[in-house]
């Protein structure tokens, strides 16, 4: 069944590749006939492709909607060509400028601090916190974007290990195809950013009590193993819980991306210079990362202050129990929206796993005949499930 997802995305990719190839070939012929500036045109085409590839479907959707709305106005002659062109040029500049905004966070020779975070959500919060503190000139940011709780990490620091991880995600996680088409390129960019950290910069690796950030922290230290910089490891979740929680107002953060940027600012300031690791500490955590990359499983949990490998089916009974406890509308004949079930599972799960893994296991339970489906399993909002009768 996994091949269904893979083939669906292969068809999509093939169409994109054909389109890019046709555009490129058209420009080559035009350039040869006219200006001879083939190299510049091709460079522009692939710059556009790179800019859009780095955005998720939800990020791209508003741009597409705006473009279609402008085309509609032009067709109906409610907008002049000059006005429409001006708006589209502004949109183009904004979209292409996103790459330049990302470059602002790369380590530079004059920076004094480099923050390393795990996950896009926490990276966004950290950027807002650093902007709020007014220290973006000297404080830079590197994000490890992987969800280390799921998918194979065997040999992740080798090309074949990364290829295996990418293949698993493309075959099992619905929205992963685009994200893993340039996995190798992104990994090499990560290594470049690590290499660019200047000797004088203090490195702060942020983590918290979940598998994703704990394994990610160990991976970060492995990548930093040859750097001579001062390295600290800090837990913003633990800090914020201790500082802000009261008996009548208590928040337990499951991952750092849940922390508001204003509270994160306080953590950055007050944890400055704390959590320093000695050489032995770093060596121990590097060894732990190497052991993790010897495991062949696809699911890990955080338990007893350790990253533990568990079976892929570990959460199946938990999902089924949640399904049994929810009451679907009478009109739906016992079928429950999968998005509601997954939302319930995430809301009560002590582990930070992510909705994509729960959705993957839900589809596996359907394929195994444990559940019945109504709809199409293209994304969780498109189908409902119930126990097979």
Predicted regions and their residues:
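Long, hydrophobic/aromatic-enriched structural stretches that serve as scaffold segments
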Residues: 171-218
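A short acidic (Asp/Glu
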Residues: 124-129, 152-154, 213-221, 243-248
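A conserved mid-domain beta-alpha-beta active-site/ligand-binding segment of alpha/beta enzyme cores
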Residues: 249-332, 336
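Short, cationic-aromatic polyanion-contact patches
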Residues: 376-389
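A short, conserved structural fragment
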Residues: 366-376
């Amino acid at each position: 069944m996994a091949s269904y997802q893979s083939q669906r995305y292969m068809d999509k990719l093939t169409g994109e590749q054909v389109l890019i190839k046709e555009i490129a070939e058209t420009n080559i012929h035009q350039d040869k006939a006219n200006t001879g500036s083939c190299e510049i045109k091709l460079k522009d085409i692939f710059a556009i492709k790179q800019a859009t590839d780095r955005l998720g479907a939800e990020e791209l959707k508003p741009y597409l909607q705006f473009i279609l709305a402008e085309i509609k106005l032009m067709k109906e002659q409610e907008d002049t060509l000059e006005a429409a062109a001006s708006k589209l040029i502004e949109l183009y500049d904004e979209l292409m400028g996103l790459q330049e905004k990302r470059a602002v966070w790369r380590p530079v020779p004059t920076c004094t601090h480099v923050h390393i975070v795990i996950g896009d959500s926490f990276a966004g919060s950290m950027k807002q916190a650093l902007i709020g503190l007014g220290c973006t000139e000297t404080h830079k940011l590197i994000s490890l974007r992987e969800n280390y709780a799921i998918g194979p990490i065997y040999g992740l620091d080798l090309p074949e290990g990364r290829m295996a991880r990418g293949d698993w995600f493309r075959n099992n996680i619905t929205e992963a195809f685009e994200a893993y088409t340039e996995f190798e390129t992104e990994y090499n960019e990560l290594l470049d950013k690590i290499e660019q950290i200047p000797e004088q910069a203090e490195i702060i690796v942020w983590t918290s009590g979940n598998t994703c950030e704990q394994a990610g922290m160990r991976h970060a230290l492995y990548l930093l193993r040859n750097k001579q910089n001062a390295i600290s490891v800090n837990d913003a979740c633990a800090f914020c819980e201790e500082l802000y929680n009261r008996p009548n107002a208590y928040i337990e953060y499951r991952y750092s991306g849940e922390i508001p940027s204003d509270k994160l600012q306080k953590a950055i300031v007050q944890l400055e210079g704390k959590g320093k690791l000695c050489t032995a500490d770093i060596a121990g955590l590097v060894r732990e990362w190497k052991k993790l990359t010897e495991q062949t499983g696809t699911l890990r949990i955080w338990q007893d202050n350790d990253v533990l490998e568990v079976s892929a089916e570990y959460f199946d009974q938990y999902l089924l129990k949640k399904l049994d406890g929810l009451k679907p509308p009478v009109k739906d004949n016992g079928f429950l929206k999968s998005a509601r079930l997954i939302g319930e599972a995430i809301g009560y799960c002590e582990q930070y796993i992510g909705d994509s893994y729960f959705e993957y296991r839900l589809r596996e339970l359907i394929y195994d005949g444990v559940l019945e489906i109504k709809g199409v399993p293209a994304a969780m909002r498109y189908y409902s499930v119930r126990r097979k009768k």
